[in-house]
Curated annotation (Swiss-Prot):
Function of the molecule: Usually encoded in the trnK tRNA gene intron. Probably assists in splicing its own and other chloroplast group II introns.
GO cellular component terms, semicolon-separated: chloroplast
GO BP annotation list: mRNA processing; RNA splicing; tRNA processing
Name of the featured protein: Maturase K
Lineage: Eukaryota, Viridiplantae, Streptophyta, Embryophyta, Tracheophyta
Similarity field: Belongs to the intron maturase 2 family. MatK subfamily.
Compartments (UniProt record): Plastid, Chloroplast
Native source species: Manihot esculenta
A GO molecular-function descriptor: RNA binding
Gene it is expressed from: matK
Domain of life of the source: Eukaryota
Alphabetically ordered keywords of this record: Chloroplast, mRNA processing, Plastid, RNA-binding, tRNA processing
Length: 506
């Protein structure tokens, strides 16, 4: 092992991001980015008040007043935040998130140094679905899994301190403290949960950046210990903190184990330990006995609590068998199923047949129908028990706009849940959306559903079929067994980079 793996990357230590805050194109870029993101439903939280005129007014106010020096006494008297506080705060936070991501992107590109085709491949790994082929390949060979809820840091100043290792710009960090000061009192020890919820809804990109940068710091140390203990080096991992003292402690730790605890050295050499983080949770999975899982669980908990002041609850972290426990993972219920197989061998010379029963492990991904119906009921597509209802609309809405809206939601859900191993629940969701669309149109035209369908014909329902379903219906006859198997097969897409409440049932 070499110490350079624990040194801070100082190749771009002169990054000065503060002047970008006063550039109009930064806010335009942030606005376009939030508008063009891939979503499953509608971006109902999008603020239509964003415009270039408001950006210019915002920048003018930032130039005219000194907002970077603030005390607890005069914060309530600051005219900048008293005037349209929430809108200006949201715009600056989105612009700040775009700006502060610049050094992250530059370090990523310079560290990878890949060919163009490999860069395209790495972009595909951003897709949410890219994790499921990995799970299909690895999880059937594993036995135990632990689902860990990652808590928020107990103090917002910890988020700023983490960012200091990335951004060498005191002005930008001071502005960040000002933003956080306006939402919470930095002298408080605990972040109120209701304020976290409000902050996430109003500034999703800004919060996710701060949260991910903080989580990545302790994950980098966790991965470093894991990779070094297996004598493997990850080319995609760059530890960005100076942890020479920590490195020395690790060497001493390994030396003590070698001298006094030789019998359990295998604990740190298990090649089947896997770590996956998604949203606010992480997964530890292993092939070996639960003893190994307990050791790594307590190491992760102690590392986060002692060095990063993130409070875990070890008693609520359970180690479960993959064959008996389902993971609520990115909108899917995933577990490992034992599928029975029959192997038939026939000897031609002696003319006898040998039948052998066997089992094969397979990752099973199911659409959680009850949470999905709850999401549809919350957005007024059906009632609490799943019966489709008409959705209230404006009287001047065109029929084509209403149909396009329902079709877009239905196709996006079909696109996201195309990896389900059982399509029955997905068919029910499509049925709810189709009938809700018909009832909405019939209500607008003051007609019954039967009369409206009779007048419109079956063309309306054909709009709800996805492009993949239309292609399969043209290539294969529906009566053929090969068509049914292909149509029911799992398909993972590499162009889905975000989800909304219909897929996020947490």
């Amino acid at each position: 092992m070499e110490e350079r793996y624990l040194e801070l990357d100082r190749s771009r230590k002169n990054d000065f991001l503060y002047p970008f805050i006063f550039r109009e194109y930064i806010y335009t870029f942030a606005h376009d980015h939030s508008l063009n993101r891939s979503i499953l439903l509608e971006n109902v939280g999008y603020d239509n008040k964003s415009s270039l005129l408001i950006v210019k007014r915002l920048i003018t106010r930032m130039y005219q007043q000194n907002h970077l020096i603030i005390s607890a006494n005069d914060s309530n008297q600051n005219l900048f935040f008293r005037y349209n506080k929430n809108l200006y705060y949201q715009m600056i936070s989105e612009g700040f998130a775009v700006i502060v991501e610049i050094p992250f992107s530059l370090r990523l590109v310079s560290s990878l140094d890949l060919e163009r085709s490999e860069i395209v491949k790495s972009h595909k790994l951003r897709s949410i679905h890219s994790i499921f082929p990995f799970l299909e390949d690895k999880f059937p060979h594993l036995n135990y899994v632990s689902d860990i809820l990652i808590p928020y840091p107990i103090h917002l100043e910890k988020l700023v301190q983490t960012l200091r290792y990335w951004v060498k710009d005191p002005s930008s960090l001071h502005l960040l403290r000002l933003f956080l000061h306006e939402y919470w009192n930095l002298n408080s020890l605990i972040i109120p949960k209701k304020f976290i919820t409000i902050f996430i809804k109003r500034n999703p990109r800004f919060f996710l950046f701060l949260y991910n940068s903080h989580v990545y710091e302790y994950e980098s140390i966790f991965f470093f210990l894991r990779n070094q203990s297996f004598h493997l080096r990850s080319i995609f991992l760059r530890v960005l903190l100076e942890r020479i003292f920590f490195y020395g402690k690790i060497e001493h730790f390994a030396e003590v184990f070698a001298n006094d605890f030789q019998a359990i050295l295998w604990l740190f050499k298990d090649p089947f330990m896997h770590y996956v983080r998604y949203q606010g949770k992480s997964i530890l999975a292993s092939k070996d006995r639960p003893f190994l899982m307990k050791k790594w669980k307590y190491y992760l908990v102690n590392l986060c609590q002692c060095h990063f002041y993130v409070w875990f609850q070890p008693e609520k972290i359970y180690i479960n068998s993959l064959s008996k426990h389902s993971l609520n993972f990115l909108g899917y219920l995933s577990n490992v199923q034992l599928n029975p197989l029959v192997v038939r061998s026939q000897m031609l010379e002696n003319s006898f047949i040998i039948d052998k029963d066997s089992t094969m492990k397979k990752l099973d991904t199911i659409v959680p129908i009850i949470p999905l119906i709850g999401s549809l009921a919350k957005t007024k597509f059906c009632n609490a028990v799943g019966h489709p209802i008409s959705k209230p609309i404006r009287a001047d809405s065109a029929d084509s706009d209403i149909i396009d809206r329902f079709v877009r939601i239905c196709r996006n859900l079909s696109h996201y849940y195309s990896g389900s191993s059982k399509k029955k629940s997905l068919y029910r969701i499509k049925y709810i959306l189709r009938l809700s669309c018909v009832k909405t149109l019939a209500r607008k035209h003051k007609s019954t559903v039967r009369a409206f369908l009779k007048r419109l014909g079956s063309e309306l329902l054909e709009e709800f079929f996805t492009e993949e379903e239309q292609i399969l219906s043209l290539i294969f006859p529906k009566v053929s067994s090969s068509s049914r198997r292909l149509y029911r097969g799992r398909v993972w897409y590499l162009d889905i980079i975000s989800i909304n409440d219909l897929a996020n049932h947490e």
